[in-house]
Amino acid sequence: MNAPVHVDQNFEEVINAARSMREIDRKRYLWMISPALPVIGIGILAGYQFSPRPIKKIFALGGPIVLHIIIPVIDTIIGKDASNPTSEEIKQLENDPYYARLVKSFIPLQYIANVYACYLVSRKKTSFIDKILLGISMGAINGIAVNTAHELSHKADRLDHILSHLALVPTGYNHFRIEHPYGHHKRAATPEDPASSQMGETFYEFWPRTVFGSLKSAIEIETHRLKRKGKKFWSKDNELLQGWGMSAAFHSSIIAIFGKGTIPYLVTQAFYGISLFEIINYIEHYGLKRQKRADGNYERTMPEHSWNNNNIVTNLFLYQLQRHSDHHAYPTRPFQALRHFDEAPELPSGYASMLLPAMIPPLWFKMMDKRVFEHYKEDLTKANIYPKRRAKILAKFGLTDPNIENGK
């Protein structure tokens, strides 16, 4: 008689573990959507290359079409998920390497898409307008790549920091790796934070304030870090210089390989990518403010200091960035373990649906100012208000400035 066949014990344990994690996180395999974004980009580029001339420009603008139209529509149809993992499940999710591999897999695919785009842009038959449109499409991917860099920037491992810089290289926004974890997380939802928008501040006023303010902050942070180690800013250990060097090497290589004709494309994708990321920054803390304690320091960051949303599709694309309150409460907590808080202020829709309204100030103010007003129970003295429009905003809600009444 043949000996009974036994299933390999190790293999069975792996299968059981995978089944267990699938039960904990029912979206486990749907998270592949985020690293699949560059693959969608590659498909858009292939469509541009091989499509008939009359529809080439539709493919050239494929990135914004997906980002601003298709994703918001699907997001609205699919709806929300406010479920939370338990404390025990959070530990299991945090220790599962599957999720970290997903985040990192975005980066090589991002570079394949970028190189493919540069090849298309370098062809003589690619018009200047198409170079700009392709730059916008790739800017959408490289802008969302900043979110990949964001997830990696909070890790303690040096390799993760390098990978974070690699995701930022196409946009040249490498100072984000320094400023976000050590600057923004310290000052979030305060008037001093260049990355927190103020009530009544348009995105076009916020953009220069956050871009240049965050750059200045990153330089100050890295200068102080090096000084504590007895080193100067112009040191090989300066992480800012390392990141900028990586970006310079990438762009120089692209120009050397594909020619100067790629410059309009490179500038466009960087500008659009940076702007896309900063629109999300604009949304995240709009008008919200941490209050000062009796000792003059700000209260700790709480769930009520970030705008949140549970729309499933946008969360799948952005590693649950919309569960922003838990991210600020636990900055090193990986995306798969982030929780929803009932007390956190809620956006009217997902980030993807809010991008276009954020670029139209009257529409944005109509959608959001009332929410800030209601969040603070009609006490706008607690809100983070844009100084230039403070009196106008208070008057809009039938309020007066107590500082003016008191002669301050």
Swiss-Prot record:
Sorted alphabetically, the Gene Ontology BP terms of this entry are: alkane catabolic process; lipid metabolic process
Look up the EC number in the record and give it: 1.14.15.3
Task: State the free-text cofactor note.
Answer: Binds 2 Fe(3+) ions per subunit.
Task: Give its localization.
Answer: Cell inner membrane
Provide the species name: Acinetobacter baylyi (strain ATCC 33305 / BD413 / ADP1)
Q: Which UniProt keywords apply?
A: Cell inner membrane, Cell membrane, Iron, Membrane, Metal-binding, Monooxygenase, Oxidoreductase, Transmembrane, Transmembrane helix
Q: Where does Fe cation 1 bind?
A: 150, 154, 180, 184
Per the record, what are the reactions this protein catalyses? Answer: octane + 2 reduced [rubredoxin] + O2 + 2 H(+) = 2 oxidized [rubredoxin] + octan-1-ol + H2O
Describe what upregulates or represses it: Induced by AlkR and n-alkanes only in stationary phase. Repressed by oxidized alkane derivatives.
Record: residues binding Fe cation 2: 185, 324, 327-328
Q: What does this protein do?
A: Catalyzes the hydroxylation of n-alkanes in the presence of a NADH-rubredoxin reductase and rubredoxin. It preferably hydroxylases long-chain-length alkanes with at least 12 carbon atoms.
What is the membrane topology here? Multi-pass membrane protein
- Record's keyword annotation contains Nucleotide-binding: no
Q: Which cofactor does it need?
A: Fe(3+)
Q: Which family, according to the similarity comment? A: Belongs to the fatty acid desaturase type 1 family. AlkB subfamily.
Which spans are transmembrane here? 30-50, 58-78, 102-122, 126-146, 254-274
The main enzyme category here is: oxidoreductase
Any idea what this protein is called?
Alkane 1-monooxygenase
